[in-house]
Amino acid sequence: MLDHFDLTIPAASSLAIVGQNGAGKTTLAKLLCRLYDPQSGGIEIDGVDLRELDLESWRARVTAVFQDFIRFELTLRDNVAPAGAPDDTVRAALESAGAANLANLDTVLARGYEGGTDLSGGQWQRIALARALCAVRLGAGLVLLDEPTAQLDVRGEAEIFERMLAETRRCTTILISHRFSTVRHADRICVLEHGRVIELGTHHELMAQGGRYRTMFDLQAKRFTAEEEEGATYDVLN
């Protein structure tokens, strides 16, 4: 739930959003997708209330990857470009997502079909990211990434998001992640707490402030070191 939420996102910039579970991160992403509309207040796109824009036209400008992304029992090509795209565009998106060699474009991504195959959770996540990158190549200008790489390790996620930010540098990109090694690369970072923005700035600015972001970043860095040494798994935001 968002409460007295006020945030301006410059076009063609990247914004990372962090905060504890229930802070309002996913709510914001779903509002921007117009999966539902705000009960009070509003969202403006270039000064126009989002609710006044044609829904179909708006969604054609947005691509989103959520943690519970869709897995189509279709060919690899149709998973990356459900609405269709040139093969060169599909292949370029797969390469940028680190999934260039997963399967032939005509391979069905499901067991039970002739020549079909299934993928691991991490491989499916790369397919979902390739779908977003393909949409960008086809004209989408707003990219929403809500914990889309939870099944990748820390280094794998950092590598993917460096590629994503490079590929979407002309887009407005919003990244939601628990991993600070990833969010630090965004142009700005927003810290949400109880539905409100409590800190906003670059990684270096927020570290210098010594506030909530600095506390969470330092704690996760220590726990990541412990995880490397002991094989344990920690989540600093829970």
Specify the residue positions occupied by each region the protein language model found.
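Conserved "ABC signature" C-loop
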Residues: 69-113, 133-140, 212-215
